[in-house]
């Protein structure tokens, strides 16, 4: 039920704030959520799949990005926010959980969530008559480099670097 899912997700998020990853277990999550471990296993199969499901839900877009004006301004603000979210400790953990999950559905869903936000920005630019790239171009040339840099390069990228990625995309229009 939706109530069980919410209770289990809340328990995972609470426990992630209190304990290290190695201390998490299905019985611990179940106890915190007020359900039996078999309920968790039946629904998610493994702790890793549960963690991936929580990560996917966290990445679900709540609202479209703020429309603060021109495409350049909005896309740069979104790129800075995306960089900040994904480079935070919880953001890194969520991405790791998604990548470690079996199958591709969680990763594909997160890509769709990201595309929804990007398309909202681009659709508003189109409505204003602004030239704009397509969502795949923004994903390939802004989102993907951010993810790569956060996970595979030393140090955290600066927000100005994320803005420069947007500048490069817009310069090619």
Annotate each PLM feature.
Residues 1-32:
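Basic, helix-initiating cap at the start of DNA-binding domains
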Residues 18-21, 41-51:
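HTH DNA-binding helix-turn interface
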Residues 26, 55-62:
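Short, basic, alpha-helical segments at the C-terminal edge of helix-turn-helix-like DNA-binding modules
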Residues 33-37:
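Short coil turns linking two alpha-helices in DNA-binding domains
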Residues 48-55, 84-105:
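Amphipathic alpha-helical segments used for helix-helix packing
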Residues 63-92, 139:
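Hydrophobic alpha-helical connector segments
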Residues 84-85, 103-128, 140:
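Amphipathic alpha-helical packing segments from all-alpha helical-bundle domains
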Residues 112-115, 126-169:
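Hydrophobic/aromatic-rich alpha-helical bundle segments in the mid-to-C-terminal region
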